[in-house]
Swiss-Prot record:
Classification via HAMAP family: Mrp_NBP35, NUBP2
Pfam families: ParA
Cited CDD domains: Mrp_NBP35
Family: Belongs to the Mrp/NBP35 ATP-binding proteins family. NUBP2/CFD1 subfamily.
Protein name in the entry: Cytosolic Fe-S cluster assembly factor CFD1
Function: Component of the cytosolic iron-sulfur (Fe/S) protein assembly (CIA) machinery. Required for maturation of extramitochondrial Fe-S proteins. The NBP35-CFD1 heterotetramer forms a Fe-S scaffold complex, mediating the de novo assembly of an Fe-S cluster and its transfer to target apoproteins.
Gene Ontology annotations for the cellular component aspect, listed alphabetically: cytosol; cytosolic [4Fe-4S] assembly scaffold complex
Keyword entries, A-Z: 4Fe-4S, ATP-binding, Cytoplasm, Iron, Iron-sulfur, Metal-binding, Nucleotide-binding
Cofactor(s) for this UniProt protein: [4Fe-4S] cluster
InterPro entries for this protein: Mrp-like_CS, Mrp/NBP35_ATP-bd, NUBP2/Cfd1_eukaryotes, P-loop_NTPase, YlxH/NBP35
Annotated source species: Mycosarcoma maydis
Top-level taxon in the UniProt lineage: Eukaryota
Length: 361
């Protein structure tokens, strides 16, 4: 099967959808939202691992090449994906064909977009009401030059909020699916029931449930201590008719990989100063959405016709992050989970209304 035949193509199935979003996502094969009922369960780390694992595997449409993956961080008030991927100092570029995402490597197999790239400082807060958040999400979908992707992973905020409603409204015709993340704690399990109810009410298919922080393996004796109990996620999945995708233990090595990634992306001072000015313009433009194809947008960069040459080719920091992740004890564990998600996403694409994949009432 060719990449073009497996990708979502503009057609009558997208009637009513925003034309700009249809144009940008027409070559994206699978869209997967990562959800959690509460904060602090490791949802963003699961999103990052899923993106890294998928980009390290073969494309489902062409086994002779590696998968092309995008990760979109719509946790607007708490963006953490840039830091986890070692891209904390990177910035988004403006081209005559829209925003250029940040790539983690020279081969451009993993594209990243987050509001964290647009902030003046990593310590800046995002104090926006619903309409401005919705406009930002719409721009991420409609103005970013995603290109051809096998998977687009969307890291969402915890709980259910304006961001979740907006993203589903914009993506409804693209038949997205979700992966839910919980911990064995009773409070996390209870909060996930609310997220599950949200999925049912919005007819969002759930591919399965991951139990994160499932035990702590001592790096000295390899004994596993179930800090927050055991089996809660699997029991919840069984009770609610979900697929249980697996358990991820607490791995100090993974914590170091994702938390200790440098915030410096070796950006030259003059480019950084220029990008600060550009980012300010981008954030101000959210009230009146930026039109990347306009002359005014192109004029924001000197030589906008040569913007392609400014496309980030991947920093040594991020390549190091990818390699360190592959060397972590968690990588083979999560690879098994990734294999399941990949197979389920393919089945969902072929049979989007399959009762096996949708949560049963």
């Amino acid at each position: 099967m060719s990449a073009s035949s497996s990708a979502i193509s503009p057609s009558a199935s997208h009637l009513g959808a925003d034309p700009k979003i249809v144009r940008r996502l027409s070559s994206v094969s699978h869209i997967i939202l990562v959800l959690s009922g509460k904060g602090g369960v490791g949802k963003s780390s699961v999103s990052a691992q899923l993106a890294l694992s998928l980009s390290s595997s073969a494309s489902p449409s062409d086994r002779s090449r590696m998968a092309r993956v995008g990760i979109l961080d719509i946790d607007l008030t708490g963006p953490s994906i840039p830091r986890m991927l070692g891209l904390g100092g990177a910035s988004v570029k403006q081209s005559t064909d829209g925003w250029v995402p940040v790539y983690t490597d020279a081969s451009q197999h993993l594209a990243v977009m987050s509001v964290g790239f647009l902030l003046r400082s990593k310590n800046d807060s995002v104090v926006w009401r619903g309409p401005k958040k919705n406009a930002m999400i719409k721009q991420f979908l409609g103005d970013v030059r995603w290109g051809t992707l096998d998977y687009l992973i969307i890291d969402t905020p915890p709980g259910t909020s304006d961001e979740h409603i907006s993203i589903l409204e914009y993506l409804r015709t693209f038949e997205p699916a979700a992966v839910m993340v919980t911990t064995p704690q009773a409070v996390s399990l209870a909060d996930n029931l609310r997220s599950l109810d949200f999925c049912r009410k919005t007819s969002l298919p759930v591919l399965g449930l991951i139990e994160n922080m499932s035990g702590y393996i001592c790096p000295h004796c390899n004994d596993c201590t179930n800090v927050w109990g055991k089996g809660g996620g699997e029991a919840l999945a069984k009770r609610e008719g979900l697929r249980f995708l697996g358990r991820i233990p607490i791995d100090p090595g993974l914590v170091r990989v994702l938390d200790d990634a440098k915030d410096d992306a070796h950006v030259e001072l003059q480019k950084q100063l220029h990008q600060t000015s550009l980012n300010d313009n981008v954030l101000k433009a959210i009230d009146q959405p930026l039109t990347p194809h306009s002359q005014s947008a192109a004029a924001q960069l000197p030589n906008s016709g040569d913007t392609e040459s400014l496309t980030p080719a991947g920093t040594m920091l991020s390549r190091t992050t990818i390699q360190r992740y592959k060397n972590s004890l968690t990588f083979p564990i999560f690879q098994e989970i990734t294999d399941q998600i990949r197979d389920l996403a393919t089945k969902h694409k072929l049979h989007p209304q399959s009762s096996v994949l949708t949560t049963a009432l």
